[in-house]
């Protein structure tokens, strides 16, 4: 289970953390019009890797939850468009994504189309989506960067206050 309290702690920690950024891997054919910057926080492959140097013990313990498959800080520059897509099966298990918005410059110009319906974010309020199953696209049409922590969890994980 991932609690709202856990997500709030991740949000508060993320707001005061400076993340070392790198360019997200480019997917063949491209999935967006601009470079997205990321800082990985947790990865699961042959072994579990957590970027403990960036974290307090409390945050490390939250990310140690085996229901969390992957986590990253993501920065979408102004004018970024993420084209319509479903996320691929990149883990051994099906997953859903917890989006934790850190900085949303403008809810009118920063949004997601989820199955054709407009969804907006509020900073610090998480939303959960089965990104493998539904076509979605994202927009930052504002003049400032939009920032999130994205947390991929096993599909059957209970996420408190799941949308």
Give the location of each predicted region.
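Non-heme Fe(II)/2-oxoglutarate
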Residues: 1-65
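Structured loops at beta-to-helix junctions and adjacent beta-edge loops in soluble globular domains
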Residues: 13, 30, 38-41, 76, ...
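Intrinsically disordered, low-complexity peptide-like regions
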Residues: 31, 83-85, 134, 138
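Intrinsic disorder/low-complexity detector
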Residues: 35, 59, 87-89, 138, ...
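Generic structural hydrophobic/aromatic packing signal, biased to beta-strands
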Residues: 38, 71-73, 138, 149
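Surface-exposed beta-strand edges and flanking loops
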Residues: 40, 52, 78, 113-115, ...
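Catalytic core of non-heme Fe(II) oxygenases with the double-stranded beta-helix
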Residues: 57-130
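Catalytic core of Fe(II)/2-oxoglutarate
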Residues: 109-163
